[in-house]
Amino acid sequence: MVISDKQTLRRCVKQAVRRAAVVETLLNFDAARGEMGIKALTTSISKAQGLTPLQADAAAAFAAMDALEMPIEDIPRAALIQSGYTREAYLREILDQMRAKRVFACVSIRDAQSAVFEDDRIAPLLTLPEDFFAPGRYGVEYARRAEEIRLAAQQCGARDVLIRQFDEDALRFCVIPACEDECLRLHVRLDTRAQADGFLRQLDASHTVRALAFGDETVEPMLIEAAATRRRLLVRVNKRIPLALEKLGLRFVPYASEADLPEQMLGRWITAREAIWPALCDAYLPLARCGYPLTSEAIARDVQALFGGHFLMDDDNTHEAYQE
């Protein structure tokens, strides 16, 4: 069906976004052993001293409970219902409600050997602790740290590694060489433009490493511009989605929950997608108005690519890229 009016466009885009299978690129949760459930979820909500909870995390928590058909008005009963699930079944229900295609759950490099997941949609995101590159008496032994990364990736089957604390020397002498040797994709948080500059220098110096970079709103425009000319770089954008659509088309990641609980992940996705689809509508509207043959099928394909298709395509091609 060719779309020619704004209301049809809005309805089509909203439906495509709500039905899309999504890739979660950062879940801060021990999927193998971490505590989850209604009790943990409600404990995470900031108390409002009897007033209406208006915090974003409260909205996400209640959105998750609603999606899981848990009674929001009766927390003890919701906890009782949840207790009837096995851990595996409860996690599977969360992923099903989210329409999760893949979830990258953090696995500390120190726990890699024991990381086992009960659902094959969960993938390990090998995570380097902030003190991993803390210098000892003789400085930092980068070769030893690189070998630890390679061994941990092999132990848990990780193809992705996250460095939370930017360190240009660590990237140059350890992380990027380890990614090259073990065919890992690098996830990196960048908090300043100087860090982004340093990271881009290291990425350009490597001819094979693929990366997913993200940062706060002030860094996002720089990362978007960088990704426009670098096929090995994907950026995750939370605030500057209209700019990313303009500069990158659909080749970026528009969301990550960075949640501490699976239920938070579900709820944050439900609330985030309601902010994403209007931005997509605004991007499509000029095409619809000028007579471009925009169809609902094309929009569904676009949305699926945006919410994980490009990321998984890069994931599938990573090993081939390292062999080029």
Language-model features: locations:
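Metal-cofactor-binding active-site regions of metalloenzymes
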Residues: 2-182, 204-208, 224-324
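Generic detector of bulky aromatic hydrophobic side chains
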Residues: 218-219, 234
